[in-house]
Amino acid sequence: MIDVKLIRENIELVEENLRKRRSKVSLDKLKALEHERLDLLKEVEQDRAKKNESSKKIGEYMKAGNKEEAEKIKEEMKNFTESLNKKEEKLSQLEEAVNNEILYLPNMLSEDVPDGDDEKANKEIIRWGEPRKFDFEVKDHVDIAMGLDILDIERAVRMSRTRFSLMKGKGAALERALINFMLKKHTSEHGYTEYVPPILVNGRTMTGTGQLPKFEEDLFKTTDDPALYLIPTAEVPLTNIYREEIIPENMLPLYCTAYTPCFRSEAGSYGRDMRGLIRQHQFDKVELVKICAADKSKEEHEKMLKDAESILQALELPYRVVVLSSGDIGNAAYKTFDIEVWLPSQNMYREISSVSNCWDYQARRMQMRTRRNGKTELVHTLNGSGIAVGRTWIAILENYQQADGSVIIPDALRPFTGFDKIEKPN
């Protein structure tokens, strides 16, 4: 969440940030609640001062032996104190209501985020590798996989519903190899510590990273009371590991990684990417999370981008990097780099990783701090896909397809697959 002090002292900045984001969030209710809170706060402070003055007088009378006057003031203060207690309770409720409204507000944006309505305003900053030129008709990943008998969408839909898939044989082995390859690279070369986190988490955990309360419709949840939520990304449990803790400065920065299945309802994407594995309700992802001191997050953001890029470079998959525009960036992000991999069947780059600096937005929600120079201060949090496994699977099939329908396995991946080619079954 953004700093309530910013809202109280410079709400015009918050309004401008909403305008830049093309956000439909209204500040009207928040302004009304804050106005009511301030009026009541003045009353409460005046009443507290009066109560303190009366308590002082009672003490003076008692000290002077004038018990009668002291008891008289005590009697007069009974109703007054009861009224003050009710006002303080109301003030507490208003403060909670203000904080609940603030939870719906998006993060403030970095000054260098491109201003624009949507993805068309994203700014390309890196392009790596040359898309392969094919001398045969290019197939998409679905046709390739079905021809190789490594994917069964029909049976997956029958046991679940649309946007689910069933990999098998060397298709399943390729998925597993990608997970192991990514984790090994991030842990052995980039300094991340691997975790195996819960994939069902509570509402407070989802609120900490910003999925709740605003994006509940995008989540799958249990019918328990209180409900548990299936994670949409391992960012959620990894970032929450140190929630409500003061992290020793000498432990920072913390580098965390995990492979998990991820679950999203895709409520807002009806009709988009219905064919194949691009947009699934369940998908595999290796996630990267960093927790660092506030003055290090910009530097760590650039390093995390390179960590994610290294996967595609090792697999020799062409990609580009864009800075997301103000109208396309996620709610919790201060600045985001998207890595987009080349898909020959679509003749375009498609997102395969988002790498975001969330500044102190998540840390404030979680009350996650460090102590520096004798003072506690909020840490900064960063997250990035390191990378989306299913979309990497797609990219390998499409970029390494052969004229006979087979798929060559990238050299870097062969120690993890145990085979160098996927061929049509006899």
UniProtKB/Swiss-Prot annotation:
Q: A Gene Ontology biological process annotation?
A: selenocysteine biosynthetic process
Coiled-coil positions: none
- Output the PROSITE patterns linked to this UniProt entry: AA_TRNA_LIGASE_II
| Catalysed conversion reaction | tRNA(Ser) + L-serine + ATP = L-seryl-tRNA(Ser) + AMP + diphosphate + H(+); tRNA(Sec) + L-serine + ATP = L-seryl-tRNA(Sec) + AMP + diphosphate + H(+)
Q: What Enzyme Commission number(s) appear in the record? A: 6.1.1.11
Q: So which domain of life are we looking at?
A: Bacteria
What EC class is this?
Answer: ligase
Q: What is this protein called?
A: Serine--tRNA ligase
Native source organism of the sequence: Brachyspira hyodysenteriae (strain ATCC 49526 / WA1)
Chain's gene name? serS
